């Protein structure tokens, strides 16, 4: 609600877009605004677990902020460098996550439902089917996250055998994000 903060974000986005970056990853995209009155977060007996119904998640003001940022990104659609984009980082179930991916909000997101799914055919099938349906409902591409810096490395979780899954097919109906290759020698260590 502070116009100075909103305008500073506008300036920062334009600064980097003007220099040709492709986009931004919005960390904890569902927690950029806290409930009015700034109430305390409920106590959580298990340190590190997210409190689902708290004053810092999914606040209505997020929509206007994300629409404001999207409008700025859309200003660059016809530039020589091409369109700009936003990627949401938020650990949310599909039905809540895709609200952030409506056509006038963020472009896509990391799909952590896939990351936390059991490594079993039925579980993966359900996760993939639900994810594709949810993303299709808002016209966004689904992504498939196997690992990140918050979780044990995939090689430790899934074993060292070659998997039958191939996420490198560019014709598949999902987006691909490739970060720094993981080092198998690190084993269970996080990035």
Each language-model region and where it sits:
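Active-site and adjacent substrate-binding regions of carbohydrate-active enzymes
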Residues: 1-191
């Amino acid at each position: 609600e502070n116009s100075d903060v909103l305008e500073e974000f506008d300036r920062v986005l334009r600064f980097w877009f003007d220099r040709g970056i492709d986009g931004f990853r919005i960390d904890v995209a569902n927690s950029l605004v806290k409930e009015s009155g700034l109430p305390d977060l409920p106590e959580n007996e298990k340190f590190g677990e997210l409190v689902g119904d708290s004053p810092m998640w999914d606040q209505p003001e997020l929509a206007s902020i994300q629409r404001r940022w999207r409008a700025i990104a859309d200003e660059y659609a016809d530039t020589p460098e091409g369109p700009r984009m936003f990627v949401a980082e938020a650990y949310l179930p599909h039905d809540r996550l895709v609200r952030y991916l409506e056509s006038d909000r963020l472009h896509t997101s990391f799909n952590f439902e896939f990351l936390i799914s059991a490594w079993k055919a039925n579980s993966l099938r359900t996760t993939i089917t639900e994810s594709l349906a949810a993303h299709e409902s808002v016209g966004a591409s689904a992504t498939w996250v196997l690992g990140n810096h918050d979780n044990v490395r995939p090689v430790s979780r899934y074993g060292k055998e070659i998997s039958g899954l191939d996420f490198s097919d560019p014709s598949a109906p999902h987006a691909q994000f490739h970060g720094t290759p993981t080092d198998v020698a690190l084993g269970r260590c996080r990035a």
